[in-house]
Design a protein with these regions (language model features):
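Short glycine/proline- and aromatic-enriched beta-strand/turn motifs that initiate or cap beta-hairpins
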Residues: 20-77, 88
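Outer-membrane beta-barrel translocator/channel fold
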Residues: 52-56, 60-65, 92-121, 167-218, ...
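Transmembrane beta-barrel strands of outer-membrane/channel proteins
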Residues: 41-47, 89-93, 123, 138-142, ...
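Outer membrane beta-barrel transmembrane domains
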Residues: 109-111, 223-226, 232-263, 282-297, ...
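Short loop/turn motifs that connect adjacent beta-strands in outer-membrane beta-barrel proteins
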Residues: 21-37, 78-86, 130-133, 162-167, ...
């Protein structure tokens, strides 16, 4: 936790002098110069434990910790024709340690994936015609760690209705991934050196429509179609058959997913908002899931608010899942990854937001400090905790 705090403080110091020098713009003037609209500094700490590790065939520790730090900078500029140009630049780095990944090599003191760093930058450009209510966007991203490299791209289109109370959005994303095939030590070919590689591709299309029903109620409908192909197993996951033999996880090379959701926000006066969300999910691996989420931000004073939240999730098992020692040679595909088992889970927590009129630490443009904590509990013996800190410059 000390590392999380120091990282956030160091990033804050980078912008301190600038925040003190820039005057507030209280006019309606739209600057044609590129300027900083918003900066978010986020640090989080995540910890989990369980006893159904897929690395050891569905048994064994799932202990894991992750420290993540991201910086998100949004820049805006208005062109001569009044077009708004937005550039969103984000960079993040995680460091994790995993007791289960340390068991890839059962005889070694430490396996290749027992701890790692992940670096994930992204860049998004939006071109908004405010007069027509139309926005187009394009973005690129990447994610790099020891055994995984991912490159992503997306395009989007949004159009508001004539009365500006509704908005339609279409978005397409693709991710091109490459995995190192780090096999369990006992399944590697004798004398083999290095690791092989395999590809995984994801294509996702999203359609959404949001509508202001009245002064108090807003709703959004969203649907996705997601197609994956390539190597969809994880190479270091073991599967133990009923005869005691050990195998490498084997899954189909295609997967098709359809999530459908609805989101609503209801404003109870000036101080309370009720935010609700429901999602139904299905795929061609016979996994079906339901998610229900509720968050109620309550403004206690002009500068302080609380946001209790709760999420319930339930899913059926994928048709290729069986616990430790239950698969047989008759199974074409097999996994003992409990993320694909039948379970239900709950996630409960609280957010605290502080927006003092004079800014955080007396820095006017650093106007928001938000702390969120959540506890996650799953019916198949997995539990986790996460705490995050977000400091916003605007």
């Amino acid at each position: 936790m000390k590392r999380v705090f120091l990282t956030g403080a160091a990033l804050l110091a980078l912008f301190q002098s600038r925040a003190q020098d820039i005057p507030a713009d209280s006019t309606g003037y739209k600057s044609r110069k590129l300027k900083v609209e918003e900066v978010n500094l986020v640090s989080s700490y995540y910890s989990q434990n369980g006893d159904h590790s897929a690395v050891t065939g569905g048994i064994g520790t799932q202990k894991l910790t992750d420290i993540a730090n991201t910086i998100d900078v949004r820049l805006i500029k208005y062109g001569q024709t009044g077009i708004k140009h937005t550039f969103d630049i984000e960079a993040g780095i995680d460091h994790y340690t995993s007791a289960s990944s340390d068991m890839i090599d059962l005889s070694a003191n430490s396996s290749a994936s027992s701890s790692d760093n992940r670096f994930y930058p992204s860049l998004t450009y939006l071109r908004e015609n405010e007069q027509k209510g139309r926005t187009i966007g394009i973005g690129v991203s990447s994610s790099t760690e020891f055994d995984y490299q991912s490159f992503g791209g997306n395009i989007s289109f949004s159009q508001k209705t004539k009365d500006r109370n509704g908005e339609f959005t279409a978005r397409f994303q693709t991710f091109i991934d490459q995995l190192k095939l780090i096999e369990p030590i006992e399944l590697r070919d004798p004398g083999s050196e290095g690791y092989g590689s395999a590809n995984r591709n994801t294509f996702a299309g999203t359609l959404s429509y949001s509508q202001v029903i009245n002064q108090r109620l807003q709703v959004m409908l969203v649907g996705d179609i997601i197609s994956q192909n390539g190597y969809l197993s994880l190479p270091f996951h073991r599967v133990y058959f009923a005869d005691g033999s050990v195998h490498q996880e084997k899954m189909p090379d295609t997967r098709f997913k359809i999530p459908l959701g609805i989101r609503a926000s209801y404003f109870m006066g000036d101080n309370i908002i009720i935010r609700a969300y429901y999602r139904y999910y299905t795929d061609d691996w016979n996994l079906k899931a339901h998610t229900a989420d509720l968050e109620i931000p309550v403004k206690l004073t002009q500068a302080f608010s609380l946001s209790p939240f709760y999420r319930y999730y339930s899913q059926s098992a994928a048709k290729y899942f069986k616990p430790y020692g239950e698969h047989t040679a008759a199974d074409e595909y097999y996994t003992s990854n409990y993320d694909l088992s039948k379970f239900n889970s709950s996630f409960v927590g609280m957010g605290l937001k502080f927006t003092p009129p004079d800014g955080i630490f007396g820095l006017k443009h650093w106007n928001t400090l938000e702390i969120r904590y959540g506890h996650y509990n799953r019916s198949n013996d997995l539990a986790s905790d996460i705490i995050s800190i977000n400091i916003k410059y605007r």
